Curated annotation (Swiss-Prot):
Chain sites annotated for binding UMP: 55, 75, 137-144
Top EC category: transferase
UniProt protein name: Uridylate kinase
Main function: Catalyzes the reversible phosphorylation of UMP to UDP.
InterPro entries xrefs: AceGlu_kinase-like_sf (IPR036393), Asp/Glu/Uridylate_kinase (IPR001048), Uridylate_kinase (IPR011817), Uridylate_kinase_bac (IPR015963)
Gene name for this UniProt entry: pyrH
Catalytic activity of the protein: UMP + ATP = UDP + ADP
GO annotation, biological process: 'de novo' CTP biosynthetic process; UDP biosynthetic process
Amino acid sequence: MNNLRYNRLLIKLSGAALKGDSNTDNFDIKKLKYIAQEILAIKNMGIEVVLVTGGGNIFRGNSAEYWKIERAEADNVGMLGTIINALMLKAALEKESNYKVRVMSAIKIEAVAEPFIRSRALSHLYKGYLIILAAGIGQPFITTDYTAAQRALELRCDAMLVAKHGVNGVFDSNPKEDTNARQYCTLAYDDFLINQLNIMDHSAVLLAKQHNLPIHIFNFDQELAAKNICLGKNIGTYISSNTKMQFSN
């Protein structure tokens, strides 16, 4: 298709997108199928796709205090959670398509995932494979948001899509607490940082700003939202260097 906005994308998925409705369900089979179908809708247009998974449905590094363990150890557990999520997504994608899917991990776990090697990841993309990146960058104190921005730059992605669960984009206040909260349609990187908007890790936005990586923050629960973004439609919030702060109608 010649009217595509992007040719290569990184999509950052939260662990919450995979989670069942019960607090005891780390995964939901219907949600996994839905995620796979949404990703494949993009892939089927000829777009190269990289996925980065969060691990919050299994374990969060910021729960270290609750578990009375050091933050570094908690982050290590969280990295393992992202590997589990990546393997579940791989299985779902392979069930719904004939595409080859590769899980690449920043920590060694070679029985189930390839090590992340940039040149190998680029080779996979050239061959038309789907790539799922897990275990962050292999270091504690680094969020998966930052990982997503770094990997998007390493793999020469045209943009980063940040898929949120139940949130339509960036708001000027918490829409769950403030009925008058307004959604931004577009933002410059500096607008996001100066206004201390907290839907995404600021270090990731700063890295994107330094290298002019466009960011789309959108509600993944909205069917075909990611595909429509790739077709040029205004969905969610778009963040870049050459956009002005505007609210949605």
